């Protein structure tokens, strides 16, 4: 009898469903996957090594470029690590602003994930719906930091500035008439908090629209139910965190188990799945968007009632205001020293983690007392998820690789670092 050999093929890195620069070497028996071998490193930028040659403040923008869909959550973990080493107390208002933007970031991430996942499986409409809502949240990013993605808004000791009193409006353009301009600016007449509150009021109906399109869709369920199943014990062994772990039935969320920022004072639920398949991971993330919206409403309510400082008043850690620099020589010296030499951080080692949209994003920082980290290790949540690709895909059809890969919510900025 002739010997039958398995067929080996490349999936990516140019494949549109490869989520960036993933190269999967698949071993196939017909259309059934016998082995899936992820090859990483095509987006490696030596972030951890670069951090050793930059001051603590200069390192902050690198965090945005790791998981470039969950920008401010990465910054939050970095700031928590530096603040632990410094022993600095963050003002309560800054903690609520961080919590607010962490949840805005979570919704941004899950909207992109849902749109891309649906597109990968073959449902195009959802992608267009999701980007409609992302636009409003990107405008919030831009209003507070000047950038739609890489915000660099958090600082060790607080946040760069308070929330603006006026939400920026669309300007007249030859490409839109006066009536359209009026429609676009209808909910931008007040402050940023007014705009976010208006969005939070509308958002649950948008999530209902996504669920109408997908949750009971027969084709969607055929592509996701029973695909890539991981049980609770195995998920823990593989190092899963975030929605990947919770969809397997493990109620582990750092916002509850190890609260940081203002999460201990807020009311929200932790969505948990049952079977640990692709469909459960979809349901958990959709439920998380609803819970994030609940948290946003509570943060907006608190921030309205409680004005106050948004960054520490220690000028050796945080820069003085521009007004002070123009009137005080000492403030100008502090500013110059902080941005030229940086701050000397006490020697020690810490680990700080946040519940990022993809899972536990952690920073392990070692300081030798200088103005630069001695070593910074980044714990990317997507890395152990991708490592389980072989186990999750084995025995499935080649078309299911796309569904399994998309359900992990892979971003290679953080995996390759």
UniProtKB/Swiss-Prot annotation:
Give the UniProt subcellular location, in the record's own words.
Cell inner membrane
Q: Which reaction does it catalyse?
A: a quinone + NADH + 5 H(+)(in) = a quinol + NAD(+) + 4 H(+)(out)
Keyword Coiled coil included in the entry's annotation: no
Query: Which Gene3D superfamilies does this chain map to?
Result: Cytochrome-c3 Hydrogenase, chain B
Q: Name one GO molecular function term.
A: quinone binding
**PROSITE patterns given in the database record:** COMPLEX1_49K (PS00535)
Q: What EC number(s) has UniProt assigned to this enzyme? A: 7.1.1.-
Give a yes or no for keyword Cell inner membrane in this entry: yes
Report the membrane topology from the UniProt record: Peripheral membrane protein
| Keyword set, alphabetical order | Cell inner membrane, Cell membrane, Membrane, NAD, Quinone, Translocase, Transport, Ubiquinone
One GO CC term on file: plasma membrane
Q: Which HAMAP family match?
A: NDH1_NuoD
Matches recorded under NCBIfam families: NuoD, PRK06075.1
- Record's subunit section: NDH-1 is composed of 14 different subunits. Subunits NuoB, C, D, E, F, and G constitute the peripheral sector of the complex.
- Please identify the protein, giving its name as recorded: NADH-quinone oxidoreductase subunit D
Name the source organism. Answer: Acidithiobacillus ferrooxidans (strain ATCC 53993 / BNL-5-31) (Leptospirillum ferrooxidans (ATCC 53993))
């Amino acid at each position: 009898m002739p010997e039958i050999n398995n067929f080996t093929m490349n999936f990516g890195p140019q494949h549109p469903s490869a989520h960036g620069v993933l190269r999967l070497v698949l071993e196939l028996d017909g259309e059934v996957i016998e082995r899936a071998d992820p090859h990483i490193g095509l987006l490696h930028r030596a972030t951890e090594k670069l951090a050793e040659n930059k001051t603590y403040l200069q390192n902050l923008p690198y965090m945005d470029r790791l998981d470039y869909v969950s920008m401010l959550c990465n910054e939050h973990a970095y700031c928590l690590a530096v603040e632990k080493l410094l022993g600095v107390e963050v003002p309560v208002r800054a903690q609520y602003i961080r919590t607010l933007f962490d949840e805005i970031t979570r919704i941004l991430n899950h909207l992109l994930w849902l749109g891309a996942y649906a597109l990968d499986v073959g449902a195009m409409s959802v992608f267009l719906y999701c980007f409609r809502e992302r636009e409003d949240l990107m405008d919030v990013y831009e209003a507070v930091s000047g950038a739609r993605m890489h915000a660099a808004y958090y600082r060790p000791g607080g946040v760069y500035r308070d929330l603006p009193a006026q939400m920026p409006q669309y300007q007249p353009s030859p490409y839109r008439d006066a009536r359209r301009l009026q429609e676009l600016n209808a909910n931008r007449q007040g402050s940023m908090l007014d705009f976010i509150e208006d969005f939070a009021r509308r958002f649950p109906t948008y999530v209902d629209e996504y669920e109408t399109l997908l949750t009971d869709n027969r084709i969607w369920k055929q592509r996701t139910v029973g695909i890539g199943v991981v049980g609770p014990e195995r998920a823990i062994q593989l190092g899963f965190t975030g929605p990947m772990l919770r969809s397997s039935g493990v109620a582990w969320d750092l916002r509850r188990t190890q609260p940081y920022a203002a999460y201990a004072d807020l009311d929200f639920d932790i969505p948990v799945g049952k079977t640990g398949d692709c469909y459960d991971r979809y349901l958990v993330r959709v439920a998380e968007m609803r819970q994030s919206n609940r948290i946003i409403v509570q943060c907006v309510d608190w921030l309205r009632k409680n004005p106050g400082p948004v960054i520490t008043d220690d000028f050796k850690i945080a820069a003085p205001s521009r007004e002070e620099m123009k009137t005080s020589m000492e403030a100008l010296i502090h500013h110059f020293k902080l941005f030229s030499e940086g701050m000397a951080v006490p020697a020690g080692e810490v680990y700080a983690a946040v519940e990022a949209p993809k899972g536990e994003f952690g920073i392990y920082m070692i300081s030798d007392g200088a103005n630069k980290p001695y070593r910074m290790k980044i714990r990317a949540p997507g890395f152990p998820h991708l490592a389980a690709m072989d186990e999750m895909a084995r025995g499935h059809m080649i078309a299911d690789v796309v569904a399994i890969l998309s359900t992990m919510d892979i971003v290679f900025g953080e995996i390759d670092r």
